[in-house]
């Protein structure tokens, strides 16, 4: 039972701490749009998106105004295009991507995800065509996001796909060189990708999902930080004893509970008004570049001088676990990624730590072993070899595969820039100093190709 004080603290979140719902994402299945005729297929796709998404933005705004809780992003996810557009080659995939971009703009949404392929065990024709089309497709569209799943705990790691994605990431960067390689900010490589992610760039609608569905991404890193700051100022827990990390975990858990209840309430009302089923609430703490809306600042509230200091991985493990516990108690419909995001360019505190040399790619990789997602929004030198990018991807995929968790890589090679120089992507994507990549050469390892087998599911040590 929530006390009067906790009810008041929830009201304070709304009035003074900028609590928001980070995204309401409409999932639309495109399997009933399939055709061997490209023109008919794209017409079917646009018609179906128009039918279900035309009121999405206005309804989200109405519900947000009703409760005083803004819905920051309105998005769409669709069935994996490599599957539903399998008959078409790379040129056809580019045309499909442009048609999706037009549909997203017509609906008024921020992004549309699902230009995706699932290749953890091998390539189908549609997968190869989509991956080949990525540079042109992402360069010629504004709102399309792509995700490629190259590994899973049951299938292992498709190293041929890892090698290919290392090359394609560089090609996407070159195709968008005039914008700092921003195409790579809309491309993410996954292990164990969930089917119901509302967050970009990994959102797509899985084959086991409903025909249409509303998924919501809650947020609130700033709210969590302020709750921790209040607890630290008080210095004692509810029983009057000195504050410990156990008490701080309880503060995070209770805050996550309240944030999740708010997010689910918004999502279910939007779904009801649209006449669409509600799917899941993704519990992820998702930062923005704004000061006060940072995951990195939470580490300072828990006693570290900065994210990246010794103890960072332990704090992240505690934070991630407490968020999940609080969110799972608040909702029976938890899904997506549900953890803490650590995107370098999108979080002012993380970006500052990386610029100061307190965070390396190696440290970020260690952190991903205890949190959701992975190496996210990291700017690297534009002349980074493809094999190095593939090696970084392989390392991150191995963490996900062995630990039965989702991990991902979103690296941005910035053409013409080197370590220490800055790149700005604008808006929620933020800015970042270019980070050095690990030394050494992975070329011979990557060219071996094939598949790293799935791990044994007993003998856990």
Swiss-Prot record:
CDD domains: RNR_PFL_like_DUF711 (cd08025). InterPro entries: UPF0210. Belongs to the UPF0210 family. Homodimer. HAMAP family: UPF0210. This is UPF0210 protein Ddes_0622. It comes from Desulfovibrio desulfuricans (strain ATCC 27774 / DSM 6949 / MB). The lineage of its organism: Bacteria, Pseudomonadati, Thermodesulfobacteriota, Desulfovibrionia, Desulfovibrionales.
């Amino acid at each position: 039972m929530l006390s009067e004080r906790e009810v008041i603290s929830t009201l304070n979140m709304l009035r003074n701490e900028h609590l928001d719902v980070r995204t309401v994402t409409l999932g639309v299945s495109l399997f009933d749009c399939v055709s061997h005729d490209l023109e008919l297929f794209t017409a079917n796709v646009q018609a179906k998106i128009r039918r279900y998404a035309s009121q999405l933005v206005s309804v989200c705004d109405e519900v947000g105004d009703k409760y005083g809780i803004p819905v920051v992003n309105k998005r769409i996810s669709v069935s994996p295009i490599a599957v539903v557009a399998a008959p078409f080659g790379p040129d056809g995939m580019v045309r499909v991507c442009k048609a999706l971009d037009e549909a997203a703009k017509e609906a008024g949404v921020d992004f549309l995800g699902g230009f995706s392929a699932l290749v953890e065990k091998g390539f189908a024709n549609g997968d190869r065509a989509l991956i080949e089309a990525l540079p042109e497709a992402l360069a010629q569209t504004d709102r399309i996001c792509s995700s490629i799943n190259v590994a899973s705990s049951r299938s292992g790691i498709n190293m041929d796909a890892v090698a290919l994605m290392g090359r394609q990431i560089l090609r996407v960067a070159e195709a968008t060189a005039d914008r700092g390689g921003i195409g790579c900010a809309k491309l993410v490589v996954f292990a164990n990708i969930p089917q119901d992610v509302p967050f970009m760039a990994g959102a797509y609608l899985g084959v086991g999902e409903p025909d249409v569905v509303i998924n919501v991404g809650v947020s609130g890193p700033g709210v969590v930080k302020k709750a921790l700051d209040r607890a630290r100022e008080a210095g004692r827990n509810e029983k009057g004893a000195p504050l410990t990390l156990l008490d701080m975990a309880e503060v995070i858990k209770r805050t996550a509970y309240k944030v999740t209840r708010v997010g689910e309430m918004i999502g279910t009302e939007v779904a009801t008004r649209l006449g669409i089923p509600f799917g899941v609430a993704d519990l992820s703490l998702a930062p923005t570049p704004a000061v006060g809306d940072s995951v990195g600042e939470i580490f300072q509230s828990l006693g570290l001088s900065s994210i990246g200091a010794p103890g960072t991985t332990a704090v992240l493990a505690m934070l991630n676990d407490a968020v999940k516990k609080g969110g799972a108690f608040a909702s029976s419909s938890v899904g997506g990624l549900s953890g803490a995001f650590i995107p370098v360019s999108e979080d002012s505190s993380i970006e500052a730590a990386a610029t100061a040399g307190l965070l390396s790619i190696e440290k970020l990789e260690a952190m991903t072993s205890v949190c959701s997602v992975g190496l996210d929004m990291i700017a690297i030198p534009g002349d980074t070899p493809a094999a190095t990018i593939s090696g970084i991807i392989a390392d991150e995929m191995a963490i996900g595969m062995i630990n039965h968790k989702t991990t991902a890589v979103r690296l941005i090679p910035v053409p013409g820039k080197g370590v220490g120089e800055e790149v700005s992507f604008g808006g929620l994507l933020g800015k970042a100093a270019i980070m050095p990549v690990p030394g050494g050469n992975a070329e011979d390892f990557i060219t071996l190709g094939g598949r790293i087998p799935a791990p044994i599911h007993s003998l856990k040590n």
